[in-house]
Every structure is written in structure tokens, then in C-alpha cells.
Amino acid sequence: MNVYVRELSREIGARGLAVDIFTRSQDPSRQRVRNLWPNVRVIHVPAGPEEPYDKHLVFNHLPQFTIGLREFAAAEGASYDLVHSHYWLSGWVARELAREWRLPTVHMFHTLGKMKNAVAQSEQERAPSERIRVEGELMRDMDRVVAATPLDRGQMVDLYGIDPKKIRIIPLGVDLDLFRPIPRDKAVAAIGVDIPSQHHLVLFVGRLDPLKGLETLFQALCRLRRSEPRLAEKMCLAVIGGDADRDSVRLSDDLECLDKLKQDMDVTDLVVFLGSRAQNTLPYYYSAAEVCVVPSHYESFGLVALEAMACGTPVIASRVGGLQLTVEDGVTGFLVPAGDADALAEKLKLILLGADLRKQLAANARRRAQAYTWQSVADHVIDLYEELWQQAL
């Protein structure tokens, strides 16, 4: 979501529209107002502890955030023409201020609580009740809602009863200048991970969240170790993950769970955990990998798959959500049933042992990704803004 907000704001600002991005302050020493690009600035508003914080507790501080945003706008003499919010927490704030300022609203959920609950495997994975309630209210109250895919749109209509006329389908984009194929030897040297040239690097990029399906990927590695021991000897899974917004205690718990999974499935020696990585370094990791795996149980779109494809890296993804539309099965990679470790292991074997197949999938992946640009996303979003402004005349 951070990538989406950043890249969309940059493109909108480049077209001459002024954009203020309001976010919760997580560091009291950080500059409160920072100019990102021409016409785009980010404002850090204190609300709750000024540190990485459990997102499930942020809801309690939304009134404070709303007051802080209102006070900033008043002090600056700022006036706005539209409020565009992302995720249900920001949507709550946007609705309150838009009512007060009588402004049109656009909202993007990115993920849906009811969809998360549909695939949750434990009570801890379920969305809180206030999220479900607020999402329903936002479906009703927002002027327009952006869906990333037709599947996303259908879920909103079926699960929340939103008026389908409110929804506009606008896919995500990828920075094709940043995410580009890099020669593998150069990429491997740049990332600094000790991988022998003849070894196969498998890549996972994502939050350390059960919904992301890492357990299924570990199970697939375990299957390959039994069925293809010679392949397993020359295979390494690099895990890039960790949420900067997650508090240190919960992140530590995630890492402990990850280590236990590796041990239980006897794949500790096949997995290296790299932690979080800066966005501008990810193309080197994607390009160093022979395949990127996105084994999620739920994805509204799946930006990681698109980034990997833009780097010419084949993708194996779960047949869920927007991944079904982004990844072309048998063309840019493979789709497998979510949670099916056997199917995932079989596709990993095909790609890792098939150099010619890998080469063809890689070429197709890059071509496919070129259809998704942030310039196109911004064009469609600005068209939506113009539609609302015309209605307000």
C-alpha cells in the first residue's frame, strides 16, 4: 500500500495537482513536513505512541489523528478539493473530514476484512469487528471506491452490498525503469548473499503474516528435499519480509514462528531470512532469483508478482484474487491452488530444472508487466477526480 500511495502521488504531482499525504508519526525526531517531489509532501501527524505500533490498536487513536490533521490544515490555511484515502483506518478519518469540509471522497480498501476472515486459519488472523463495521460504512458513504480488479469489485458487491455504480476498476502499476531485468551475475554480486553460481535461488517477498503462505512454501521445500534431494542440495530460499509498521515484539514473535516452521519441516539449511529491504534494491533480488513465489491465501492484487515479472523473473503464485489476472498460467509462470504444497513443489521443480522454460517464462513475464504503468494508473485516477468535480458544479 505504501508503494501505491507513493507512486500514485508522484505521478499526480507531476501533472500539476498538489498532494498532501497525511500519515501517523512513528518517530518524534522526524521532520513533520517533508517535500517528496514537486507538488507532493508528506505530513507526519502524532496520534498514539510515536513509534512502530500494532495496527490493530491504531483505531483507538483515529480521533486524535483527525484533530491533528484538522489543526495542521487550519494553521497552514490549506484548503482541499478532494479526499482520497487508503485502507479502512484512513477511510474513517477521510469520511469525518470530508463531511466537515463538504468534499468529494475516493477510497481504496486494498484488502477486505471479510475476505481475510474467509481464509483465516485462527482467531488471531481474523479482522477485528470494528474493521468489518467501518468497511461497511465506507462502502455506503464514500462517493467512489477504487477496485484493483473485477474480482475485487465482485467481492465488495457480494460481501458488503455496495452499489456497483460507485466502483471504478483501476489496476495497480509498476515502475518499469526501476524494476527491470539485471544480469544475474551482477545482481547476485550486488545483493551480497553467498550463493554459488550453480545454485538455484528462490525468492519470497512479503509480510511475515500467515495469510502470505510461507508455511506452504516451506512444506513444498520439504517435499522437494524428499523427492529431489540433488535439487534440494543446490537450492536456497531467500525470504525478504518484515513490516516497518509492526512493533518490535510482534515482529520478534513472527521471526520465532518462522524459525520454528523451518525446524519442524527440516528446511533450516535451505532458507535464509534477509529482513526488510529498501524498494530500490529489490530489482537485484528479483533478478538474482530463478523464480519468485507468491503463495498467499488472499491477495487483492499482488504487486510483488508484478514487480518480479517486470524484472523478467517467472512467478509461481496462488490461484487467488488478483494474482489470477496478473500471472498468466504457463506463460509468465504458474498458478497453483492456495495451500497446495505438492502442486507448488512440482512447479518449482519444473522451473528450477528447466533452463529453456525459465528463459521463455522470463521473456513473457517482462512483456506482460509492461502493460501496467503508474502513468496509466494516474490517468485513470485523475479522470475519476474530474468526474466528481464535474458532479459538484
Predicted regions and their residues:
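Short alpha-helical donor nucleotide-sugar binding micro-motif in glycosyltransferases
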Residues: 276, 284-289
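Aromatic "clamp/platform" in nucleotide-sugar-dependent glycosyltransferases that forms part
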Residues: 297
